[in-house]
């Protein structure tokens, strides 16, 4: 799921994120098979979120994707068929950021430790963490099995979207008083292309590094409402410390 925002007029405009089943790549394209080998599917009886494999035993995802019983599925392309490259590994630990706020969606980041290490190969591999924070205009790749259109069923095969990082000023203008220093916007102000329902937790990869985590937005692919992503570069110390201690 991707968190969607609904607006209520109370003299001023207040926004409250609510979990809504509305998260798949809109306006993208079918990824070349196994071209995103770090992409994982989080399964709780069915696909609920995406994630990124950052070591052979750790996955990066969104805190709002937490579920008490998760299976991490690697090497997937068509999530409804067994194609031979899959590795299904149960989660041993799920560690949410201690300052995650489900109302503001700040610090929307989670680490998942696999019960056993993944076998790395051409179809299952890790993605590096960023060395620097993303800059406006950088082209990135977003991927996931989220819905292709708000309110519709999810696709069976992995979808991809190429989209630019937007400036902080554009992001704040799109979502007044909602963007924290731990978030950034990516996408197209004209709408039509975006992450959506069930893309949540999935990777935003820029220049070969995982810079973002699909987090929230106002609907999907709406004009003037780009997707909002967790800024991974702000959490490098927490990620390294958490892995070292667990």
Swiss-Prot record:
Gene3D superfamilies per UniProt: Trypsin-like serine proteases (2.40.10.10)
Catalytic residue list: 64 (charge relay system), 108 (charge relay system), 200 (charge relay system)
Localization per record: Secreted, Extracellular space
Disulphide bonds in the chain: 31-160, 49-65, 133-233, 140-206, 171-185, 196-220
Catalysed reactions, semicolon-separated: Preferential cleavage: Arg-|-Xaa, Lys-|-Xaa
The enzyme's E.C. designation: 3.4.21.4
Positions of the propeptide segment: 16-24
Keywords assigned: Calcium, Digestion, Disulfide bond, Hydrolase, Metal-binding, Protease, Secreted, Serine protease, Signal, Zymogen
Main location (coarse class): secreted
Signal peptide: 1-15
Cofactor: Ca(2+)
An example Gene Ontology biological process: proteolysis
Domain of life of the source: Eukaryota
Pfam hit, one: Trypsin
Positions of Ca(2+) binding: 76, 78, 86
One Gene Ontology term, aspect cellular component: extracellular space
Annotated site (Required for specificity): 194
GO molecular function, one term: serine-type endopeptidase activity
Comment on bound cofactor: Binds 1 Ca(2+) ion per subunit.
Every Peptidase S1 domain range: 25-244
InterPro entries for the chain: Peptidase_S1_PA, Peptidase_S1_PA_chymotrypsin, Peptidase_S1A, Serine_Proteases_S1, Trypsin_dom, TRYPSIN_HIS
Protein family: Belongs to the peptidase S1 family.
Protein's name according to its UniProt entry: Trypsin V-A
């Amino acid at each position: 799921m991707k968190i969607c925002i609904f607006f209520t007029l109370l003299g001023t405009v207040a926004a409250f994120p609510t979990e809504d089943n509305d998260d798949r790549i809109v306006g993208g394209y079918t990824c070349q098979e196994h071209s995103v080998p770090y992409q994982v599917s989080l399964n709780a009886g069915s696909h609920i979120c995406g994630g990124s494999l950052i070591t052979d035993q750790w996955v990066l995802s969104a805190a709002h994707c937490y579920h008490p019983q998760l299976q991490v599925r690697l090497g997937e392309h068509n999530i409804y068929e067994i194609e031979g490259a899959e590795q299904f590994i149960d989660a041993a630990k799920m560690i949410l950021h201690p300052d995650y706020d489900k109302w503001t969606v700040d610090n929307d980041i989670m680490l998942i430790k696999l019960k056993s290490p993944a076998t790395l190969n051409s179809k299952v591999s890790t993605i590096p963490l960023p060395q620097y924070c993303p800059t406006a205009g950088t082209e990135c790749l977003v991927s996931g099995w989220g819905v292709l259109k708000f309110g519709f069923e999810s696709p069976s095969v992995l979808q991809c979207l190429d989209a630019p990082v937007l400036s902080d000023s554009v992001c704040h203008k799109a979502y007044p008083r909602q963007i924290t220093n731990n978030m950034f916007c990516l996408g197209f102000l004209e709408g039509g292309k975006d992450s959506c329902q069930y893309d949540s937790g999935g990777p935003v990869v820029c220049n070969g590094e995982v810079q973002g985590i699909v987090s929230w937005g106002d609907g999907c692919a709406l004009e003037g409402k780009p997707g909002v992503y967790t800024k991974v570069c702000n959490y490098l110390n927490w990620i390294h410390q958490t892995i070292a201690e667990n």
